[in-house]
Amino acid sequence: MKKWYLIAATLLLQMQSVPAIHNKSGNVKVCRKVISFTPPLRIPLILSGSFGELRPSHFHGGIDFKTDGKTGLPVYSIADGYVSKIFVSYGSGYMVHITHPNGYTSIYRHMIGFSPVIMNYTLNYQYRHQIDQCEITLKPNELRVRQGDQIGFSGNEGFSMGPHLHLDLYRTDNGDFVDPTPFFMSHFKDTRKPQATGIRLFPQHGTGIIGGRTDQVSFYPANGKIIKGWGWIGVGVKCHDYQDASYSQHGVRYVSLYVDGKLKCSTNMACFSRTENLMKSAWVENDFEKMYREPGNRMRIMKADPQRGLVFVNQERDYKCQLVLRDLYGNESKYNFVIRGRKQTVPQWKFSGNVLIHWNRINIISRPGVQVIIPKLMVPNDLSIHLQVHASTGLSDVYQLDNQPTLLLGSCELQIRLKHPVPQGDERKLYIASQSPMGWKSCGGIYRNGFIITKIEKLGTYKLMIDNTPPKISVLSMGAGSRLAFIVGDSGSGLRSYRGFVDGKFVLLHLRRQSNKMEYKLSEAQVKRGGIHKFELIAVDNVGNVSTYKNSFRW
């Protein structure tokens, strides 16, 4: 137990090591330096997504600006600096990193294109390497920008649910994502208080009980609610914040739990690392933010007392609890409830599954045909899972690692044995597939000594599959409207690469996730107008199957 207290104390010191003072002017004082940024858009700023908002498997790493429901708005650099990375990606569309001399790097995602200078640099790289999706790292003296220079156009590219601009801000030295909101506070109006929509009590396994039961108890946050309990009990809250000009729900910046007037636990969603971004399940369960630290929770956003924020009910009296929600503007809501101490027998915890995963040690789970190697610190606390093996006549049995998909705090290794031999050379076409609501999805994998091995981030349902089918190419346009357009898909291992050629010369087909369509706009700079041209499209999937489409068109 003492070792855990030392770890917690160290984390608290780390969290306090970079003080930041913000005010409504938008200037932020960090380590005695005053840092300011200008807006990336020239329209009134309205947030559609806040920093640290809950996503299915992670936290939102930046803020989303509404763009009036339109694409194509100019996007500007928020400060002097240089373009350090350029991405054209399936997930984020056109994306650029700008490194600033003040210690921060800004990222602009989901754009439909770059400014002419950045676009020309990108196109030269793409044509030189004959690729569409790319990641380019630049030197400080290659593409410099000034504050307010246009760098791109807002869009709806990649994993986007509507037109917006996503802005990330991270510390250049260590990569920690930082909330950009304090730098733009003067551009927002916020008089609305954060709201709680539910409170949940978590009796701890083998040491806590509520109303004679060991089940979690949820209730609407009405002041004066009384819950009878005994032993060690955790508190969680489901909450949202709002701004005046938007109906969007945002995350709450500050949450605190007080018991009998003393602070037990607090969270400040100010920054997190890429590693911490995978730790959502250590802090959040069914959208309830736990106001206590699980043993495996290493997130620095949380500060807890020596009891990890847990309420220790060991007297037959009322324990007065208060949850305080506060936003950056000082808007605050308070919710009071009582845990009434009633002595009850706490039953010994008996895990319901057939496998127990320990949070603080390496776990090796072996069953015939499968092995899972889970490093330590990959689960928040000791976790009981129910592993099932479903017999199959396929390439492997089906392995259900838990009754429902369970997120890990990182990745682990999964090995599945091949039951039936495949033709020599086809081992490279094998992959591990994960079951999802949309069907079976490839998780990749490599063949080694009769097993396929890959990394997974959740305890779901898996099996082996083989992909002998090349990508499917469907033609949408062969020169009509001065464009070449196709839909290229691969339902097995997934599409890895694609290249188009007109009269033997590479042309850039850009793939857009929203429509799953790739398109090339014919240009006289690359294709001579007038006459018949030969076109070739080559698509390759992730296990090496190749599709080739050839045709001629008049333009």
Residue ranges and their predicted role:
Residues 312-317, 456-458, 524-532:
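Surface-exposed, short loops/turns at beta-strand junctions within beta-sandwich domains
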Residues 348-359, 385-431:
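Proteolytic processing hotspots in large secreted/extracellular or virion-associated proteins
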Residues 405-459, 497-499, 506-507:
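Proteolytic-maturation and junctional protease-sensitive modules
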Residues 19-106, 112-116, 132-141, 146-147, ...:
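Surface-exposed, glycine-biased beta-strand/turn segments
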Residues 105-140, 214-224, 251, 258-314, ...:
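Exoplasmic/lumenal beta-rich domain surfaces
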Residues 244-253, 425-427, 489-504:
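Solvent-exposed loop/turn segments flanking beta-strands in beta-repeat/beta-sandwich domains
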Residues 331-348, 549-555:
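Short beta-strand elements
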